[in-house]
Amino acid sequence: MLEMLKSWYSRRLSDPQAMGLLAILLFGFISIYFFGDLIAPLLIALVLSYLLEIPINFLNQYLKCPRMLATILIFGSFIGLAAVFFLVLVPMLWNQTISLLSDLPAMFNKSNEWLLNLPKNYPELIDYSMVDSIFNSVREKILGFGESAVKLSLASIMNLVSLGIYAFLVPLMMFFMLKDKSELLQGVSRFLPKNRNLAFXRWKEMQQQISNYIHGKLLEILIVTLITYIIFLIFGLNYPLLLAFAVGLSVLVPYIGAVIVTIPVALVALFQFGISPTFWYIIIAFAVSQLLDGNLLVPYLFSEAVNLHPLIIIISVLIFGGLWGFWGVFFAIPLATLVKAVINALPQD
């Protein structure tokens, strides 16, 4: 066994370039895993700066706009959009969330009436003991949800201070990262291993693919949210922005997200309209929008993305989401692509 490990090491990891690549990745993983909470503002600023780099480079290289001016224009536009989101959309989402929570008791009573009628209408399928069991189970779930909501509210109040600090630090760090990009990269390169050519080569190969994926995913979220919001408005569905926002975020979790988000959409439509033609119109329109997203929008936006097996994508979402939460889910596919590229970069037999 020991000889096999030595043989594998000599074939795969004896190359100094491969060791340099693994050292960089290992350092990054350990830093994020153990110190992620401490360096979270830095990581957020780094990711957002990376996203803004493409429009800045476009203004700088193709329109001959000085980098400082391009940075100010793009950064200012980003701050403006962020202000609109937090000052306009977030209050609307909050109000619809409060409205949904206040309507939950009425929904619960309506579901009780519906369940109580089942033994009368279908005595051969369900009896009153089964209905009582369902009532007790739902009641326990609601009580547990209420306790969680109270804890979450208290935690949210405590996190307001952190949010205020982030709101100041992140834009400040973003601006200096964008303005002084060259100087910062030169400073960071001094701490990297000397045998880093392989790592740089792999990064250059993947950089465009990762950039295309991130921008494509953000565009997909925007398009899906807008389309579903229009659908919900047309049919007069309650909480349209809240549900549309949830549908938009569901694209971050491939395959699983679409299934999960269908449940609240269907339940809200059912409680509002019952089993009526309007209910089925909403379900059909929503299903068509999901089919168009999966079969038309995704292939168009991600035609340049590295092809990964669906099982690998799901496993990546579970692993990286478990490690790093929201950001792990968002970057699951780029990280899986990175792992694949690293494996391919190691010396072969």
Curated annotation (Swiss-Prot):
Record keywords: Cell membrane, Membrane, Transmembrane, Transmembrane helix, Transport
Main location: membrane
GO biological process, any: transmembrane transport
Bilayer-crossing regions: 24-44, 72-92, 157-177, 221-241, 251-271, 282-302, 311-331
Protein's membrane topology: Multi-pass membrane protein
UniProt cross-references to InterPro entries, sorted A to Z: AI-2E-like
A GO cellular-component term linked to this record: plasma membrane
Pfam families (UniProt xref): AI-2E_transport
Compartments reported by the entry: Cell membrane
UniProt xrefs under PANTHER family: PERMEASE PERM-RELATED, TRANSMEMBRANE PROTEIN
Family classification: Belongs to the autoinducer-2 exporter (AI-2E) (TC 2.A.86) family.
Protein name listed in UniProt: Putative permease PerM homolog
Organism: Haemophilus influenzae (strain ATCC 51907 / DSM 11121 / KW20 / Rd)
